[in-house]
C-alpha cells in the first residue's frame, strides 16, 4: 500500500513500480499485495480516464482481474476484485450497447 500512497494520483507509476518489484522479486511474500495494488491502480486510472480511453482501460482492468484471480483464486481480496470486475464489465457492456 505504501507504493500506491507515495505516488499520489499517479496510477501508472504505481503500476510500473509494483510490476518492477514483482519482476525483480518474483517469489516475494508480498506478491498478492502488489498484485492487488496493480489491479486497484488500473481500475482507478480507468475510472478517471477521459472518455476516449476509458473503455480500453476498463478492458485492461478486466484482463488484470483474470490474471489476479488465476494466480490467487482464494485471495483475501476476493470480494474486492469481484466487485472491480463486475463494475468494469458493466461499463464495457454498456459501452457496447
Question: Positions of the model-derived regions?
Answer:
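Acidic, polar-rich low-complexity tracts and alpha-helical solenoid repeat scaffolds
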Residues: 1-97
